[in-house]
């Protein structure tokens, strides 16, 4: 082997080793959010936000899940086919006294629902959530913190922000023997998740597929095993919760794991 060939081979080996290490390494730091952008906002759900319960993210009762009224339904352009569920936004009304609350306050909301398009209406007159518009349909109590009721729709500025949650990531396990459907809620940091894996005490890690919203499924038989979960957020950071469900777990139970740092 010539000296040149040896150096090339050594460089390729070092490069491959570096790429493998970078791929498997943990990403340092915390989620930092994004830049301010422009959109519009309306409201729904009534003065008590009761009409916002359930929704396309699968969170069910938003009060008991800890989201409360600080929620929003996202237009197609923002919803990302459900992968944006759990993302957190800071929103403020464009500083216009005709439509905005004095002082230009901002609100913090979590994406919990989908605002469907209405192609029977033009995008600037009723079809507020039609693509490609970026639009937030806010729980009514949150809208009234930034905009006047008589306005109906207001121009806003928004940005992604880190989600700050109390307690750990929650895993609600539903399904039956050969089908596990896990609802993932209360995610801090980026808030929205791109991947979930589950590990039984007698199995290797099994990558789950997204069923809908933030419900993730697996066909592995896990009954009688303690369960660990690994959640990967949209910023590619991962959080592993070891043995959060004991071997005696039952379908319908919720378990709290390790959350992301904020």
From Swiss-Prot:
Q: Name one GO biological process term.
A: response to gibberellin
User: Residue ranges of the Expansin-like CBD domain?
Assistant: 178-257
Q: Boundaries of each Expansin-like EG45 domain copy?
A: 54-168
UniProt topology in membrane: Peripheral membrane protein
Report keywords, A-Z: Cell wall, Cell wall biogenesis/degradation, Disulfide bond, Membrane, Secreted, Signal
The record's section on InterPro entries has:
Expan_Lol_pI (IPR007118), Expansin (IPR002963), Expansin/allergen_DPBB_dom (IPR007112), Expansin_CBD (IPR007117), Expansin_CBD_sf (IPR036749), RlpA-like_DPBB (IPR009009), RlpA-like_sf (IPR036908)
Name where it's found: Secreted, Cell wall; Membrane
Q: Which residues form a coiled coil?
A: none
Q: Does the keyword Signal apply?
A: yes
Gene3D superfamilies assigned to the protein according to its UniProt record, in alphabetical order: Expansin, cellulose-binding-like domain, RlpA-like domain
Signal peptide extent: 1-25
Keyword presence, Signal: yes
Its biological purpose: Causes loosening and extension of plant cell walls by disrupting non-covalent bonding between cellulose microfibrils and matrix glucans. No enzymatic activity has been found.
Protein name per UniProt: Expansin-A3
Tell me the gene name. Answer: EXPA3
